[in-house]
Amino acid sequence: MLPPEARALAKPYFEVLIVDNVNEHQERWLRSNVTRMRRSEDPFVYEALVVPSLEDALVAVLFNHNIQAIVVRPGLVLKSRMDQEIVARFLTRAGGQEEIDNMLPENYGPELCRLVAKVRPELDAYLVTERSVEEIAGLDLGICRRVFYNQEDFMELHLNILRGVQARNKTPFFTALTEYSKQPTGVFHAMPISRGKSISRSHWIQDMGAFYGPNIFLAETSATSGGLDSLLEPHGPIKEAQELASRAFGSKQTFFATNGTSTCNKSVVQALVRPGDIVLVDRDCHKSHHYGMVLAGAQVCYLDSYPLNEYSMYGAVPLREIKHQLLKLKAEGKLDRVRLLLLTNCTFDGLVYNVERVLEECLAIKPDLIFLWDEAWFAFARFNPTYRKRPAIAAAGNPKHTLPSDTPPRL
């Protein structure tokens, strides 16, 4: 393996999945044509993987995270040559197994694009088809970025693949910061640091400069010196970075903060809770939430998690306990004062809630209940097909299947 310094300078590597039922000779032809398109000026390097069926393609995107694009060709078949139990479970859970089994072969490609969108929505798909434009135009193609009609234009496909990956690889704020660090800027708001000059000229702390390197000081910036953007009123690279973060995490909007998770938690609690509101809170939640409740003037009803004695740790708050407290407050005539339910998903020990079920059963008791899910330990879930449906943001984005009201839950 290359050392970190060499890897940082090397071109990023990814893999492209080609789905087509071809023989060994045709597979070599596909791979060689893809390899032949490489150019020295390309920002990335990729290799092609070829699988014959829809089921094989689903297994590949579920378990191979090097795959960043998928090319669906008209020759794909439905079933794998191997028994893929995990795919059968996925299709059953997605509610489409019987429908797919009865599907015409010409619809396998569009259906694969739709299924991949459920497990790896960040991928780009490219559909190669022999069907007419009129037939394709009205179909739901999921993550399909472009359709190629009756052609083998590998260069055009190659350029589209690179363009799609480049769009997801953009780092607007980091790029702006690196450009800013190269400018001959004078700093007057923090004189002791002065872009590292006081360190490089010191007789005593040269080791500090050697440890951190010059870039961390050259990238010194603040709202007073300008040159980048404003966290309070973003309009440039920070705004663009926040928009890309929203797309990555599936949120409506994203805000960056430099105060850490604790201050963010207190800010959210104070924005949602009014003095005198009753709030149901996981007793084991992060301490910043407790501070936020004090600052907001909330009346807290603590919820206890269940013990896991065999592992010497605690689990999550049982749904039965949450419903018991809501019904108890309802019997006391205080349900109208209940404002918010605060839970940690996943817990500090890795236990995950069934968020959709919690939403469904709590909203049946109090339809205007606000849910605050602390998922600081679960940010990775969006990027893993196994956990993708477990974060609160996924449940909020798909309420129509399980929730008793047409109004999406407030999260």
What name fits each language-model region?
Residues 168, 172, 232, 236, ...:
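Conserved active-site and cofactor/substrate-binding residues in soluble primary-metabolism enzymes
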Residues 67:
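Ligand/cofactor-recognition surfaces for anionic moieties
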Residues 1, 207-263:
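Conserved N-terminal alpha-helix of the aminotransferase class I/II PLP-enzyme fold
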Residues 10, 22, 240-242:
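Beta-sandwich/jelly-roll carbohydrate-recognition scaffolds of carbohydrate-active enzymes
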